[in-house]
C-alpha cells in the first residue's frame, strides 16, 4: 500500500461517494467511525461491536438479538434507500429505486478485517475504548490527514501514521464540555497539520 496513488484510492469498486468518504473507505476509517457511531447510537460497549468486511456491499448492517436471531438491512450499494427509510421511519415510502435481485449476487462473502494492513480501524477502536475526547481527536486528525493526501502532501500510508501520532501527542479530556470539544478539535487539527509539514 506504500505506493497507492490518489487515483487508485479514489476508485471504489461498489460505491459512488465523494473524495473524502472514498479515502475513508480505502483506509477503513469509515468503518472505524461507524463503530464509534454504533457505540453511541445503541449504547454499546466496544466488545459488543464487530466489523465484518463484505466485498459485495449488499448487507449494510445487521443486528443480532439476545435470542441469536438476526435482522439485516440489505440492498444495492446505494445509500438513497437507507436514508429514505431513516427519514420516513417507521413508515415505508414507495420509491422507484432499482430493486435488488438475489440472482445477480449468487454468493455473499464475509471476511475479518485486516487491522494490521488497515490500522485506522484499530485506531478507531482504541479511541472508542479510551473514550473521553479521543474519538474527537481521531476524527479531527483524520479529516486533516485525508485532505493532505488528496492535496498530494502525504502518501497513503502516512494518513494512519499522522492520526496515530496526533492521538499520542494529544492529552485526553475525560468528560469534555461542548466548548472543550471545539478546542480539542482545533488543537488536534493544528497538531496534525504540524506533523504533516
Give names to the regions the model predicted:
Residues 1-197:
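Catalytic, metal-anchored helix/loop core of enzyme active sites in primary metabolism
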Amino acid at each position: 500500500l506504500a505506493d497507492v496513488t490518489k487515483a487508485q484510492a479514489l476508485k471504489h469498486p461498489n460505491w459512488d461517494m465523494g473524495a473524502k468518504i472514498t479515502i475513508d473507505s480505502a483506509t477503513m476509517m469509515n468503518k472505524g467511525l461507524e463503530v464509534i457511531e454504533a457505540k453511541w447510537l445503541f449504547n454499546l460497549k466496544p466488545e459488543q461491536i464487530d466489523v465484518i468486511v463484505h466485498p459485495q456491499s449488499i448487507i449494510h448492517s445487521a443486528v443480532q438479538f439476545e435470542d441469536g436471531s438476526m435482522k439485516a438491512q440489505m440492498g444495492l450499494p446505494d445509500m438513497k434507500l437507507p436514508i429514505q427509510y431513516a427519514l420516513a421511519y417507521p413508515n415505508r415510502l414507495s420509491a422507484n429505486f432499482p430493486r435488488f435481485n438475489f440472482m445477480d449476487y449468487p454468493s455473499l462473502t464475509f471476511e475479518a478485517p485486516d487491522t494490521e494492513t488497515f490500522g485506522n480501524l484499530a485506531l478507531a477502536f482504541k479511541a472508542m475504548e479510551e473514550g473521553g475526547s479521543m474519538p474527537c481527536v481521531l476524527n479531527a486528525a483524520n479529516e486533516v490527514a485525508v485532505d493532505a493526501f488528496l492535496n498530494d502532501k502525504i502518501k497513503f500510508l502516512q494518513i494512519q501514521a499522522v492520526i496515530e501520532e496526533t492521538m499520542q501527542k494529544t492529552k485526553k479530556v475525560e468528560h469534555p464540555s461542548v466548548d472543550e470539544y471545539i478546542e480539542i478539535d482545533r488543537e488536534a487539527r493544528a497538531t496534525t497539520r504540524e506533523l504533516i509539514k
